[in-house]
Amino acid sequence: LTACGTGPMMTFHAGDVQVVRGVTNELIERLMNKGFSPGHIFDTTGYTYTVTPFSAEGMKLELEDMMAEAGVELLYHSVVCDVEYENAVINSVEVYGKNGKRCIESRMFVDASGDCDLAFLAGLETNKGREADGKCQPMTMNFKVINVDTDRVKEYIMNNNDEFPRLKSDLSKVTRAPKLSIGGYVNTLKKAQKTGKISFQ
């Protein structure tokens, strides 16, 4: 969430009903209290029910605070590099960080690497991608643009709604949204591809 620029979290709702709460919603409330998130707002891209924008830097700070409050010892810039296990039970993991290697013993380990690092090192069977060819979903590639005239963007959307097919059912979302996220410019993109200004598959 904080490293890849994926923007908002989606979604905490199924229609009008909030279905995700717990510690995740506690995090959002804390972010809102510090001005790092507007909270749950309706989705203007048309992908889902609601989105929850947040400041990546603000979230880093708040997650760190929550960990400190819970008594968690954080190991920065560290990765698991080896696992000691016996009879399908992990006894310890070896972590490599800025201060070298460190052995950590525990009765329980949770693999939160996102890549099955711990499971793989422990000899468990892991799979990558879809069964047919092992290919994975393409990663989202985002970048930030500053000093955008959002009023002009909204005006363009309202006057060129064929460029934004996901918004056709309710263009009023564009003017009502506290934060604007859109998927579109489809004709502009096709024209740029056709003229060779951009090229991708």
Question: Could you say what each language-model-derived stretch is?
Answer:
Residues 1-82, 86, 137:
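Conserved N-terminal/central alpha/beta ligand/cofactor-binding core
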Residues 87-93:
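Short, hydrophobic/aromatic-rich segments at coil-to-beta transitions
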Residues 74-76, 111-112, 120:
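General beta-strand structural signal in soluble alpha/beta enzymes
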Residues 97-108, 113:
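Core beta-strand elements of the Rossmann-like FAD/NAD(P) dinucleotide-binding domain
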Residues 2, 9, 118-201:
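Rossmann-like dinucleotide-binding core of oxidoreductases
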Residues 88, 113, 136-140:
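Short, solvent-exposed loop/turn segments at the edges of secondary structure
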Residues 91, 102, 116:
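Glycine-centered loop/turn positions within well-structured domains
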